[in-house]
Amino acid sequence: MNVYMKEKTRVFCQNSFDDLDDNIGIVMPILTECDVDEDFTEGIEKVGDTIPILPLRNMVLFPGVALPVIIGRPKSMRLIKEAVHKKSLIGVVCQKEMGTEDPILEDLYTTGVIADIVRVLEMPDGSTTVILQGKKRFELNELTETDPYLSGKITVLEDTKPDKTDREFEALISTIKDLTIKMLGAVAEPPRDLIFSIKNNKNVLYVVNFSCSNIPSGSAEKQQLLLIGDLKERAYRLLFILNREYQLVELKASIQMKTHEDINQQQKEYFLQQQIKTIQEELGGNINELEIKELREKASRKKWPAEVAQVFEKELRKLERLHPQSPDYSVQTQYVQNIVNLPWNEYSKDNFNLSHAQKVLDRDHYGLEKVKERIIEHLAVLKLKGDMKSPIICLYGPPGVGKTSLGRSIAEALRRKYVRVSLGGLHDEAEIRGHRRTYIGAMCGRIIQNIQKAGTSNPVFILDEIDKITNDFKGDPASALLEVLDPEQNNAFHDNYLDIDYDLSKVMFIATANNLNTISQPLLDRMELIEVSGYIMEEKVEIAAKHLVPKQMDVHGLKKGSVKFPKKTLQVIVEAYTRESGVRELDKKIAKIMRKLARKVASDEPIPTSIKPEDLYEYLGAVEYSRDKYQGNDYAGVVTGLAWTAVGGEILFVESSLSKGKGSKLTLTGNLGDVMKESAMLALEYIHAHAAQFNINEELFENWNVHVHVPEGAIPKDGPSAGITMVTSLVSAFTQRKVKKNLAMTGEITLRGKVLPVGGIKEKILAAKRAGIKELILCKENEKDINEIKPEYLKGLVFHYVSDIQQVVDLALLREKVDNPLF
């Protein structure tokens, strides 16, 4: 007898690891060669009415078939040893339940097979494997013994074979062989000798029983085959099962073909997930019903457009077909959740109470009248016409003046949600428009993210530091903002990740910037520009008294009103310890004082009830900054001008002197910029050309060199506003006339002697007032700027408005000459 163990016939084995007797490995049937007429009844005549019974777990033995069985139970081991010793046949039956350890008659199928023990193998792991070959079927009538092993009374059953001339049965056997080989080929490349053995085996009893033993079915179905005594009927039933199993194999192969392109050969887990995915497509089922149900419930409450609903439903169906462990599952889930979590057509109700809005804005911010006025105007229009598009405002000005915090107050005044995006250093366009979903880690842009965070479609949206945007090879974010900030386009803003248009027309965008020069012109055109200028000293004192001092007291745990800060003290802090346009540094200085006071309170030391100016040295140290004061008119050529800086207004002295020389030499010192140098040259040329008009001797220009100096040479200075100051200084130097006391001036000049307007008037005027100036000379066109300044800030000042240089000289210079004139 030749014995073959065919590894690749695994598909025809018992289901899998269930084919065990206790601790058994995978069991494979053995294909044997036999004669055409062999009926496997050799030695059957020696079998009596009683025979030893070997119960098998989940295994059914058929006549003629050789089957390896691993023996584990002590009773089974005892039975095998005695049967081998006596060279006797045994009865093999299948248990109904695999878990039964010590079966009785009711636990066994009563139809079994008489078997011969072909070989006993001692395995390396200590287990024992026996090879059994079936002989003839029998009926187990009763169990006569249960110890040391099972024995029972049996009745031998005969198989009915068709006539050899039965062509139908012959065709049936041929079909069974072909189908068996097809099943082998559908799973793997079968060995040629295996195919040859199946095709050329002429023993019909063996062919039928071998196939019955190897079908991938449960023991109950195999037992039904064993019960059938008519071989032809058994073959028909076998063919039915083979056809069914072959269709299943084909379906598995089809599933593998469908998923083959998506399979990563190195990831077994991914392969299994793709199989599950295709199975779910075939069955139309879904194992994530709860999560899908929640998403559908959310979607049912949305007021979104029809096209959005269509996209959502399409993407949700994709999600239904994915397994939770699939790599695409989390990506698809995130996308669907982003769609459903957006506030489609959901708006917070605006508060149209204008007095409430004004109170909120005045409470949180001192000054800023233009900005407040614009917000109140917008609120009034919304009250009258509810569907108006929100304005797009750009607040620009120096740092620390409250541009960003103003946005929060506007949101509170309107009772809208507040969101803020910092654009400083942004250089990737995808941060605005979002990343396309093809990229790993793709997400919505910052606009859509913050709309989702706000939960409404009409928040107050702060685009902070819009002037700090940069661009590189990843695109230009400023260009992406063109769509966001265009009222004619942002009703259909397209985010690359969502790939759906979203309406931003009701969002109130407020951009903040320090420098408009770095913002592209198309972007500037889309925004309403509102300047938030630096605070003057009086405004800083008010802000400190009303906001900063109470805030810092609360932050440092001091009782409200326990320490007072007189306005004079706050004024000294502003002038001597800070130099800024906003109030950030002022806030830090007040916090420093509060820390020292808190330390005293914690140490049970007494603290003053009021902080006086002379106490500031103890808390803040030595004075950090000093402001220029008017120094009189005792020197020819010294004139007081006015300048504007990023931290406010300043007075500016222009000094001109003459020295003996060849003439026509102009020296400029004081770290002057190009524009200021040109103003000095222009002033000298003008008075030279109009020397007679100013009563200047022409010979002075030929024999005297001119030196113009602006003090504080370490500080760069530039701008045209010192034009009339330089003319006055040079005329005073060439005529040795005194300059009028307590007078300052600012204005640009032309070669024709005209005076042009300049900017920063508010800051310059307040700087002059702090320096003790009483009179100011301004361009006639700057008169409109004076009207926008609060009257209390102008008290004690006299303004002279001029349009040409002669008027300036007549107002500024006295007829009286200085002491000890040069000529």
Curated annotation (Swiss-Prot):
One of its GO terms (cellular component) is cytoplasm. GO terms for molecular function: ATP binding; ATP hydrolysis activity; ATP-dependent peptidase activity; sequence-specific DNA binding; serine-type endopeptidase activity. ATP binds at G397, P398, P399, G400, V401, G402, K403, T404. The active site is at S721, K764. PROSITE patterns: LON_N, LON_PROTEOLYTIC, LON_SER. Pfam families: AAA, Lon_C, Lon_lid, LON_substr_bdg. Residues 633-815 form the Lon proteolytic domain. It is found in: Cytoplasm. Belongs to the peptidase S16 family. This is Lon protease. It comes from Parabacteroides distasonis (strain ATCC 8503 / DSM 20701 / CIP 104284 / JCM 5825 / NCTC 11152).
